[in-house]
């Protein structure tokens, strides 16, 4: 990739409002074909979330233009917990949990076509004396204390364990530069202090690459309330489809306001800027159609969950919101619905049972819905309370109830 092409790439990141800071644009422009860039992912949960996808999509953008990339799982850093701009100390994970998290996140990252390295490999044979002599000797304590991410925690308390986090992240960078020709590091803007520590380790080394290393950060994608996107409303938007379904992600994106939709489209989609601007223009001319939101939902769900996930999300959306004919609802659709709408298992099925389940508050309310022809079971409109029998079950012993226009339930007869 040429010098000019790298300039154009950086300009596009700025236009998309992805890029926040870069230590040296010139060093990025002079990146050699055998040199690369990495981003770290700590295994603090069994899945990455939408906030992490900003970093994943950045690695994919770099990969697409021919730059070598590496996703680094924090097997070592994850054992400590990053204190950066955190108001309290993070709970330490036990080894069993950490290893289980690592395996799942490794598979997630690999599913996006990214090569993966576990930083635990760097430290597994290093003892405390090695660490103090090789790592600790190369950094000044006053320099570390002056960092904003550390200073903000000093008054409320910061353990030596968390204080060491930036040393390990910094040493990662030096190790990767020395052994894998990874001379660039990227990350969220809250990682700047930790990343610069790595630059300092490299500059003080005897590496031939010591004057070539650089770091750059991305803006943090936030919701309309200024909260990090991965943890909107206190519920992480997981990338694992079993933890946060493609349907829920599709609906989440579909319901973004215009300003947020435009921002997320620029950040998370791989559509050409010209195409995005055309979509924004069309949307502004006919906002009722929500052209921007529909295209955003399609792009992001497809990129994360593939064509299969997108088809499921769109099909469930049709079932729940567009009055799809019951004959078009397959058994697989019902299995997906079980993850999304209230699901019950029963040993018998009748009117009293669905009242006992809380679907209706009383027999009176049930009769009101029936009289207004507002109750369907497996596609059949119920006209009499006595029609609610087990004979309505499908071949899989399932009942799909539609109460009014908005409420759906699945009941399984066992």
From Swiss-Prot:
InterPro entries: aa-tRNA-synth_Ic (IPR002305), Rossmann-like_a/b/a_fold (IPR014729), S4_RNA-bd_sf (IPR036986), SYY-like_C (IPR054608), Tyr-tRNA-ligase (IPR002307), Tyr-tRNA-ligase_bac-type (IPR024088), Tyr-tRNA-ligase_bac_1 (IPR024107). Keywords: Aminoacyl-tRNA synthetase, ATP-binding, Cytoplasm, Ligase, Nucleotide-binding, Protein biosynthesis, RNA-binding. Residues 349-414 form the S4 RNA-binding domain. A motif ('HIGH' region) lies at residues 43-52. Its EC number is 6.1.1.1. One of its GO terms (molecular function) is RNA binding. It comes from the Bacteria. L-tyrosine binds at residues 38, 165, 169. CDD domains: TyrRS_core. It is found in: Cytoplasm. GO terms for cellular component: cytosol. It catalyses: tRNA(Tyr) + L-tyrosine + ATP = L-tyrosyl-tRNA(Tyr) + AMP + diphosphate + H(+). ATP binds at residue 231. PANTHER family: TYROSINE--TRNA LIGASE, MITOCHONDRIAL, TYROSYL-TRNA SYNTHETASE. Homodimer. Belongs to the class-I aminoacyl-tRNA synthetase family. TyrS type 1 subfamily. Catalyzes the attachment of tyrosine to tRNA(Tyr) in a two-step reaction: tyrosine is first activated by ATP to form Tyr-AMP and then transferred to the acceptor end of tRNA(Tyr). NCBIfam families: tyrS. This is Tyrosine--tRNA ligase. It comes from Mesomycoplasma hyopneumoniae (strain J / ATCC 25934 / NCTC 10110). The gene is tyrS.
């Amino acid at each position: 990739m040429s010098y000019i092409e790298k300039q154009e790439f950086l300009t596009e990141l700025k236009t998309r409002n992805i890029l926040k800071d870069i230590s040296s644009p010139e060093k990025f422009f002079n990146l050699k074909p055998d040199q690369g860039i990495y981003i770290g992912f700590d295994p603090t949960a069994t899945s990455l979330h939408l906030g992490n996808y900003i970093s994943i999509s950045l690695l994919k953008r770099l990969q697409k233009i021919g730059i070598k990339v590496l996703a680094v799982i924090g097997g070592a850093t994850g054992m400590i917990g990053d204190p950066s701009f955190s108001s309290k100390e993070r709970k330490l994970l036990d080894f069993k949990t950490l290893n289980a998290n690592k395996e799942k996140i490794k598979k997630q990252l690999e599913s996006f076509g990214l090569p993966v390295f576990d930083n635990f490999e760097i430290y597994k044979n290093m003892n405390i004396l090695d660490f103090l002599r090789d790592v600790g000797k190369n950094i000044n304590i006053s320099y570390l204390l002056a960092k904003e991410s550390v200073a903000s925690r000093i008054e409320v308390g910061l353990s030596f364990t968390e204080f060491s986090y930036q040393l390990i992240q910094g040493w990662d960078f030096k190790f990767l530069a020395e052994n894998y020709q990874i001379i660039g590091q990227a990350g969220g803007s809250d990682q700047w202090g930790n990343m610069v520590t790595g630059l300092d380790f490299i500059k003080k080394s005897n590496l031939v690459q010591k004057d070539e290393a650089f770091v750059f950060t991305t803006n943090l994608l936030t919701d309309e309330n200024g909260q990090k996107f991965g943890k909107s409303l206190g519920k992480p938007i997981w990338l694992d489809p079993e933890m946060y379904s493609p349907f829920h992600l599709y609906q989440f994106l579909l319901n973004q306001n215009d300003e947020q939709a435009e921002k997320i489209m620029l950040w998370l989609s791989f559509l050409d800027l010209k195409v995005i601007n055309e979509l924004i223009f069309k949307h502004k001319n006919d906002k009722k159609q929500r052209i921007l939101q529909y295209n955003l939902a399609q792009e992001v769900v497809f990129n994360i969950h593939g064509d299969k996930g997108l088809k499921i999300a769109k099909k469930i959306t049709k079932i729940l919101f567009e009055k799809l004919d019951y004959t078009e609802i397959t058994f697989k659709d019902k299995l997906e619905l079980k993850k999304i709408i209230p699901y019950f298992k029963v040993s018998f099925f009748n009117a009293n049972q669905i009242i006992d389940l809380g679907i209706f508050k009383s027999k009176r309310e049930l009769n009101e819905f029936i009289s207004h022809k507002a109750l369907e079971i497996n596609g059949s409109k119920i006209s009499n309370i006595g029609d609610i029998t087990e004979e309505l079950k499908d071949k899989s012993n399932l009942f799909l109830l539609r109460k009014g226009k908005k409420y759906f339930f699945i009941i399984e007869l066992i």
